């Protein structure tokens, strides 16, 4: 059976049957479809609202709050930006501030993860 045939057959299922199929696949392979489905829904929503809009390629990482471990956040900001101690401290104290701008999505997510790992609140724009 080809993948195309399988997809067509699955497309003929009722919602109840499709739900049962998902449950059976989850049990058989020991996985959960919930996170993947949520990501798909979230990714599909903007496309439905503005189909002509292109996917964003440049992102800004904005520090919204330093959290409990301000010293560690300052250290990470210094490492990421190359700023001096005073400049990094001023940036963290003045939150919300942009830490990095015009960077790729992968790099922005990496920067955001590093900041979140030390307790900072971060936003990608």
Swiss-Prot record:
GO terms for molecular function: mRNA binding; structural constituent of ribosome. Signal peptide: none annotated. Keywords: Ribonucleoprotein, Ribosomal protein. It holds the Pfam family Ribosomal_L12. GO terms for cellular component: cytosolic large ribosomal subunit. GO terms for biological process: translation. InterPro entries: Ribosomal_bL12 (IPR000206), Ribosomal_bL12_C (IPR013823), Ribosomal_bL12_C/ClpS-like (IPR014719), Ribosomal_bL12_oligo (IPR008932), Ribosomal_bL12_oligo_N_sf (IPR036235). Forms part of the ribosomal stalk which helps the ribosome interact with GTP-bound translation factors. Is thus essential for accurate translation. Homodimer. Part of the ribosomal stalk of the 50S ribosomal subunit. Forms a multimeric L10(L12)X complex, where L10 forms an elongated spine to which 2 to 4 L12 dimers bind in a sequential fashion. Binds GTP-bound translation factors. Belongs to the bacterial ribosomal protein bL12 family. This is Large ribosomal subunit protein bL12. It comes from Chlorobium phaeobacteroides (strain DSM 266 / SMG 266 / 2430).
